[in-house]
Curated annotation (Swiss-Prot):
Taxonomic path: Bacteria, Pseudomonadati, Pseudomonadota, Gammaproteobacteria, Chromatiales
SS bond partners: none
Source species of the chain: Thioalkalivibrio sulfidiphilus (strain HL-EbGR7)
Residues holding [4Fe-4S] cluster: C60, C64, C67
Cofactor-binding details, from the entry: Binds 1 [4Fe-4S] cluster. The cluster is coordinated with 3 cysteines and an exchangeable S-adenosyl-L-methionine. Binds 1 [2Fe-2S] cluster. The cluster is coordinated with 3 cysteines and 1 arginine.
Protein name, per record: Biotin synthase
SMART domains xrefs: BATS (SM00876), Elp3 (SM00729)
Length: 340
């Protein structure tokens, strides 16, 4: 395969051996290729900033091996019922005042009931009135539920694939890979932007990481947002004690995601507290251009806002303004015009 070009065609037919060849290139060659692609589609010094709030915490019936919110695991976690609307809106106002352009809300459910969906819709409508983009992660959705969220004004829906189809069963048994793909299809068909990525460092192989990216890049449309999480090990979960991923392997995965999905936002998600500033800077160079802002992500720690602000200043990076988020589209070879 020839080196990546700024005008390279956006593809949906990647083969795993091609992806492994990319991942295995000399580190500097891979980062140069990824950065070249990144510059063709985005301002390399702008990072989209989101804030994430847990609107319902704990007691989830799923058995995801990485998650402290699972009812299957012995974890010290204070369970919380669905938050009142005004508490959610106050958190959204605070996020807006600190520079967030998107407000993400997560509930520890297998899937929302119709009653809970009514309350969630009120949250979407209220946050939209504050001038923020909205994102939800509520578990699996039916096509009808996805359409209702779209009608309420939901901009993004997060539903991660987590890992490769082959490794998936070693992490989760209560929800199938196909269940996840079907929810993504319902979200896309409803006209909601898709946010979908995975978690690295769960004991998977490089091939598993390549297969995860292959699944995402070969969807009929690339996810507008691709969150890449570095496993946060929580005592009491089955994955506590897993050998940590080589940081360079994490950067390689970020770079490969950028090449495979040139017009998508690639987000550094959970696990940034374990990353030195230098590692985050490498990730930004390799094509990461989105972060979660705030001291906590659902139930796991996140770098403080002051730390992120200082890091941005040191790197000459600035938060992406809401009005500037129409940075890239899949149909326009190079720098382009539609919201991503």
């Amino acid at each position: 395969m020839s080196p990546a070009s700024p005008m390279s065609e956006i593809r949906h037919d990647w083969q795993v051996d091609e992806i492994l060849e990319l991942m295995g290139r000399p580190f500097n060659d891979l980062l140069f290729a990824a950065h070249t692609v990144h510059r063709a589609h985005f301002d390399p010094n702008a990072v989209q900033v989101s804030t994430l709030l847990s609107i319902k915490t704990g007691a989830c019936p799923e058995d995801c091996g990485y998650c402290p919110q699972s009812a299957h695991h012995e974890v010290e976690l204070e369970r919380e019922r669905l938050l009142p609307l005004e508490e959610v809106l106050e958190a959204a106002r605070n996020a807006r005042s600190h520079g967030a352009s998107r407000f993400c809300m997560g509930a520890a459910w297998r899937n929302p009931t119709d009653r809970n969906l009514e309350r969630v819709i009120e949250m979407v409508e209220g946050v939209k009135q504050l001038g923020l983009e909205t994102c939800m992660t509520l578990g699996m959705l039916t096509d009808a539920q996805a359409r209702r969220l779209k009608d309420a004004g939901l901009d993004y829906y997060n539903h991660n694939l987590d890992t490769s189809p082959e490794f998936y069963g070693q992490v989760i048994t209560t929800r199938t890979y196909q269940d996840r793909l079907e929810t993504l299809a319902h979200v896309r068909e409803a006209g909601i932007n898709v946010c979908s990525g995975g978690i690295l460092g769960m004991g998977e192989s490089r091939r598993d990481r390549a297969r995860l990216l292959q699944q995402l890049a070969n969807l009929p449309r690339h996810p507008e947002s691709v969150p890449i999480n570095n496993l946060v090990q929580v005592e009491g979960t089955p994955l506590a004690g897993t050998e940590a991923l080589d940081p360079f392997e994490f950067v390689r995965t970020i770079a490969t995601a950028r090449i495979l999905m040139p017009a998508s936002y690639v987000r550094l998600s959970a696990g940034r507290t374990e990353m030195h500033d230098e590692l985050q800077a490498l990730c930004f160079f390799a094509g990461a251009n989105s972060i979660f802002y705030g001291d906590k992500l659902l139930t796991t720690p996140n770098p403080g806002e002051n730390h992120d602000r200082a890091l941005f200043e040191r790197l000459g990076i600035h938060p992406l303004e809401h009005s500037d988020e129409g940075a890239s589209c899949e149909t326009c070879g190079g720098v382009d015009i539609h919201a991503a």
